[in-house]
A protein has these predicted regions:
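Active-site rim helix/loop that mediates acceptor-substrate recognition in acyltransferases
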Residues: 1-30
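Short alpha-helical functional segments enriched in proximate histidine and acidic residues
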Residues: 71, 75
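Conserved acetyl-CoA-binding loop-helix of GNAT-fold acetyltransferases
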Residues: 51, 57-70, 82
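Short, well-ordered beta-strand micro-motif
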Residues: 23-25, 120-124
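Conserved catalytic-core motifs of GNAT/GCN5-like acyltransferases
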Residues: 83, 92, 97-120
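Conserved beta-strand in the GNAT
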Residues: 23, 29-38, 42-50
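A generic "binding-loop/recognition-motif" signal
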Residues: 42, 86-87
Length: 127
């Protein structure tokens, strides 16, 4: 958060969408997390992907993203999208492609933070 890689979230904002979040834990210790937020137009955002430093490069982050994408497919979303400032190549390896502002649902597009210079990535899920 301090380096601007992640967006700061309040406890209240997380609590409001707690069911959107998944965690990777071993012995009740959380080592990674992520969220799948539903939007209009049958789309969902993969968000808040974070992995503890000692678990990076272990596949935890990829497993979380794959789980969220599989969940989106099961729930019938037509597309998932994400915004990233740092992990572009990693998300490409997971199957995401470059997107544009027009690919975002209107409510997300209307609140896009141009100051972050986030790249928009998309993954059509198909039927």
């Amino acid at each position: 958060i301090a380096k601007g890689y992640l967006i700061s979230r309040t406890q209240e904002s997380i609590s409001e969408k707690l069911s959107d979040y998944v965690v990777y834990a071993i012995d009740n210790v959380i080592h990674g997390c992520g969220a799948l937020h539903a939007f209009e137009d049958n789309t969902a955002e993969v968000a808040a992907i974070a992995v503890a430093a000692n678990y990076r490069k272990s596949g935890v982050g990829a497993a979380i993203v794959r789980h969220l994408v599989a969940t989106a497919r099961m729930r019938g979303f037509r597309m998932v999208f994400l915004l990233t400032t740092q992990a572009l190549d990693w998300f490409y390896q997971l199957g995401f492609k470059d997107g544009t502002l027009e690919d975002l649902p209107r409510s997300k597009r209307d609140h896009y933070n141009y100051k972050r210079h986030s790249r928009i990535l998309v993954m059509p899920l198909g039927k």
